Swiss-Prot record:
Subcellular compartments: Cytoplasm
Residues reported in the UniProt entry to bind ATP: 75-82
Protein name as annotated: Protein RecA
Function: Can catalyze the hydrolysis of ATP in the presence of single-stranded DNA, the ATP-dependent uptake of single-stranded DNA by duplex DNA, and the ATP-dependent hybridization of homologous single-stranded DNAs. It interacts with LexA causing its activation and leading to its autocatalytic cleavage.
Gene: recA
Native species: Burkholderia mallei (strain ATCC 23344)
């Protein structure tokens, strides 16, 4: 009996000490600096922005890329890294958000971005001279609290000032890795606070002397791997042909890391030259998988009505009838437990129809 009284006394003392500590922390660092997870506001719904690919939104588990987080997209050359990020920018702009593009590679094709649905006059662009300058610009934009999304293209092009000012053969090991590590330590908290999505595009390098395992690695050290909430590995796996002409690439994206949903899922979609991700093609493929769209031989039909013979014709039908495409997409999302597409994030064809 005495022991139980003693135990309850200690518990009461601990509770009082904890309450005093929490009050002191809140007084020193502000309200909300520490809280219990059950207090309501601690757990928030993750806000997302669509990737422009229905399959990838589903593979990410939350319906898109999470805001207030760092995302890394990496892959070989011409695999669709920049195309994917430009599609995300277009989706963010459709929701009324402001986006910035830090073009460290000095290679952004403005006409191509416009074709993908990016509102180019509203896009903020910077072409910095050094890695330090690029990351300082990112820091200033994030701290302003008025930017919804920033893309850095690419980590490999963030060249430290010392390297630019030095001689061609100078050995400066670990300089870029230290720069990235310092920048991410500084940025992460602000990114979360301002709910800004920051996407780093990265390139692949080969590790020398690797006999077993994967010899591929990404540039810029290990910091980005740790600080990223989502890491996407994008690869070109085939070509899309119309008669004998190659009109696009078949692309696979693997979710290598995901802190907001189970990882290791993947999505396969088409990237058409001059158009970007073929959302209509994905709706057809995923609709057939979910048994929402019927396929008999070469014919595709929806709700008993034929929508086209062959994938190209069915894709064209959905492009001309965006309301049917939206209906099928929302049914696919519903069947897979992913949030329905918001009204503002219409397809490109729908927006063009409205403008006309």
């Amino acid at each position: 009996m005495e022991e139980s009284k003693k135990g309850s006394g200690l518990t009461a003392e601990k509770s009082k000490a904890l309450a005093a500590a929490l009050a002191q922390i809140e007084k020193q660092f502000g309200k909300g600096s520490i809280m219990r997870l059950g207090d309501g506001e601690a757990v928030e719904d993750i806000q997302v922005v669509s990737t422009g690919s229905l399959g990838l939104d589903i593979a990410l588990g939350v319906g898109g890329l999470p805001r207030g987080r760092v995302v890394e997209i990496y892959g070989p050359e011409s695999s669709g890294k920049t195309t994917l990020t430009l599609q995300v920018i277009a989706e963010m702009q459709k929701l009324g958000g402001t986006a910035a593009f830090i073009d460290a590679e000095h290679a952004l094709d403005v006409q191509y971005a416009s074709k993908l649905g990016v509102n180019v006059p509203e896009l903020l662009i910077s072409q910095p001279d050094t890695g330090e300058q690029a990351l300082e610009i990112v820091d200033a934009l994030v701290r302003s609290g008025s930017i919804d999304m920033i893309v850095i293209d690419s980590v490999a092009a963030l060249v430290p000032k010392a390297e630019i000012e030095g001689e061609m053969g100078d050995a400066l090991p670990g300089l870029q890795a230290r720069l990235m590590s310092q920048a991410l330590r500084k940025l992460t908290g602000t990114i979360k606070r301002t709910n800004c999505l920051v996407i780093f595009i990265n390139q692949i390098r080969m590790k020398i002397g690797v006999m077993f395992g994967n010899p591929e690695t990404t540039t810029g050290g290990n910091a980005l791997k740790f600080y990223s909430s989502v890491r996407l590995d994008i690869r070109r796996i085939g070509s899309i042909k119309k008669n004998d002409e190659v009109i696009g690439n078949e692309t696979r994206v693997k979710v290598v890391k995901n802190k907001v949903s189970p990882p290791f899922r993947e999505a396969i979609f088409d990237i058409l030259y001059g158009e970007g991700i073929s959302r209509q093609g994905e709706i057809i493929d995923l609709g057939v998988q979910a048994k929402i769209v019927d396929k008999a031989g070469a014919w595709y039909s929806y709700s008993g009505e034929k929508i086209g013979q062959g994938k190209d014709n069915a894709r064209e039908f959905l492009r001309e009838n965006p309301e049917i495409a939206r209906e099928i997409e929302n049914r696919i999302r519903e069947s897979l437990g992913v949030a329905a597409m918001p009204q503002g994030a219409g397809s490109e064809a729908e927006i063009m129809d409205e403008e006309e």
